[in-house]
Design a protein with these regions (language model features):
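Conserved N-terminal structural module of periplasmic/extracytoplasmic solute-binding proteins
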Residues: 19-91, 107, 279, 292-293, ...
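Extracytoplasmic/periplasmic substrate-binding proteins
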Residues: 30, 227-316
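Extracytoplasmic/periplasmic substrate-recognition and gating elements
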Residues: 49-50, 55-57, 77, 143-144, ...
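Hinge/lid segment of periplasmic solute-binding proteins
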Residues: 86-135, 142, 284-286
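Short, solvent-exposed loop/beta-turn-alpha elements that line the ligand-binding surface or hinge
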Residues: 100-114, 176, 181, 198-227, ...
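Extracytoplasmic/periplasmic solute-binding protein
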Residues: 125, 132, 158-214, 261
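Glycine-centered hinge/linker elements that transmit conformational signals in sensory
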Residues: 161-165, 208-245
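C-terminal capping/gating helix-and-loop segments adjacent to ligand/active sites or protein-protein/ligand interfaces
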Residues: 299-300, 306, 339-346, 360-417
Length: 417
């Protein structure tokens, strides 16, 4: 009898092990880049078909929505995703108890853009190399006899804006610039994060964080901030006011794609949108030139990182690590990142070049050098959206540059460390 019971127990244990080994694992990806959602959906479907015991789903929250708030809501509902995004130190500090060590992942040795914890542990998978400046329609500039290569100083850009503004009817323009700063329209990040990065990083060496560090200490470079404010006010002045104050991502991009604006304050992530809208004109980037010191530098970095939830089950974590390795190191992953999603890859082994014109402009700028880092992701969670964004929007409403400078200065004093 004892022998029979022993055999039965061992048999049940083996059945349990086999069942556990063959049980399907489901992992969910929660991300914020709405422009790549269709491509990501196709990729996770492909991966799920290629790995029968793993199902990957993807959910996208975009359009300037509160991504951090959405993750908090998921955590409160016991629905914390297995793979999600952080955008820098602010996100890491907030979610560090839910971020796994990815030291054993194959992709780590294939990139210089991994996100590392303060202890030097790789924890973040770089989504891509992204960048921005002031995008331009080369055909419109040529029609106005403006050479974009000469637009390297504030005075040169200002003269070009004035000339184009006087030719709007002739050129079929609604505005010189397509820019948005609406909090309700979800474009708060365009100005309070991306354009404002020119204050933090412009005209400095790539790893020179002195201006940003000074701001985080509660001290602003008053001359630099005043010059930036003049430039920002100029962008606002020459923008379509409806898009500026009430527009959303789609309306901002559509104005540029349709030839209704000569410039746009967006990054290379709009390449797929431009293709979908049928924009075939040549385009490129100039820098955010707010000083008279010549610059061609663009603002380039990894925009965000996938992290794996360390509180997920061991099986889910292992499946998530394998999924990210597949994305980074296989031809299928390279095809998704570059050919389908139009991203500039963050991984050295990926040799496919992006076809999108703005992404190609970034590749050229990277080869040229003299580009600038991103610092807005190091601000505390919610600071860019809920503190800075209303200040940037208010300047578009009342044009009070002194009040803008005072409000920005006070905002950084409130988070001084």
């Amino acid at each position: 009898m004892k022998k029979l019971l022993s055999i039965l127990v061992v048999t049940l244990m083996l059945v349990g092990v086999v069942s556990a080994a063959s049980a399907e694992v489901t992992i969910d990806v929660f991300q914020l880049k709405v422009e790549i959602d269709p491509m990501l959906q196709d990729f996770v479907k492909l991966y799920s078909e290629m790995t029968p015991d793993v199902t990957v789903t993807a959910e996208t929250l975009g359009g300037g929505a509160d991504y951090g708030g959405a993750i908090k809501a998921k955590l409160a509902a016991d629905q914390m995703p297995v793979i999600y995004m952080i955008e820098g130190a602010g996100g890491y500090d907030l979610w560090k108890d839910y971020i796994a060590d990815m030291s054993g992942s194959a992709w780590v040795a294939d990139t210089d853009l991994a996100y590392y914890s303060p202890e030097g542990v790789p924890v973040g998978f770089p989504i891509a190399m992204e960048g921005f400046g002031l995008g331009y329609n080369a055909d419109i500039l040529a029609a106005a006899d403006i050479d974009p290569a000469t637009l390297t100083t504030l005075s040169a850009v200002k003269a070009a804006f004035e000339k184009l503004d006087g030719m709007k009817a002739e050129l079929g323009l609604d505005s010189v610039v397509s820019c948005g700063t609406s909090t309700s329209g979800g474009l708060w990040w365009v100005t309070s994060q991306h354009v404002f990065d020119a204050y933090y990083a412009g005209y400095l060496d790539y790893n020179d964080s002195s201006v940003y560090d000074m701001a985080r200490a509660g001290q602003m470079d008053t001359e630099r901030l005043a010059a930036f404010t003049d430039y920002l006010a100029m962008l606002y002045q020459y923008s379509d006011q409806e898009i500026l104050l009430n527009g959303n991502y789609d309306s901002q991009v559509a104005a540029f794609a349709g030839g209704k604006a000569a410039f746009i304050t967006q990054g290379n992530w709009i390449d797929p949108n431009l293709a979908q809208l049928g924009a075939t004109f040549p385009m490129g980037y100039i820098s955010h030139c707010y000083l008279e010191e010549p610059t061609q530098g663009l603002f380039m970095a990894a925009p965000s990182w996938f992290v794996v939830n360390s509180q997920a089950t061991p099986e889910q974590q292992a499946a998530a690590f394998a999924f990210l390795d597949f994305m980074a190191t296989t031809p299928e992953g390279a095809n998704y990142m570059v050919a389908e999603a139009g991203m500039v890859p963050a991984f050295k082994s990926v040799t496919i070049l992006p076809s999108g014109p703005l992404s190609r402009a970034l590749v050229e700028a990277s080869a040229r050098g003299g580009n600038y880092n991103w610092y807005f992701g190091q601000n505390p969670d919610g600071f860019n959206q809920y503190t800075l964004a209303p200040i940037f929007e208010l300047l578009a409403v009342d044009s009070d540059k002194d009040a803008f400078i005072a409000d920005v200065t006070a905002a950084f004093a409130s988070i001084a460390q």
